[in-house]
């Protein structure tokens, strides 16, 4: 792999929001998701209220309870300059919950999966 190719892969891996990709195409999206997947970064934002999760078919430390508590703490902290956590299903669930609490409007989280096991696993993470 040459230096330019390595830089492209590193740049795609660093993209946390698919809406921020330059030259948006199917190939760019798949390449970005692939690079993130290969580094065990399985969650990627799509704008401010959507998330893509690629099932790694293995344990990923980012789904641990300790990580869940970090995301919950992100919303309890009142620091205006706090760094935002990387995209995660815990973050999406927190956003929906706290938006519901602030606005008293119902919220929905839609799940789509080709695998029932993946669907159930993400559902369990959301329910935590």
Language-model region placement:
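N-terminal entry segment of cytoskeletal motor ATPase domains
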Residues: 1-112, 117-120, 128
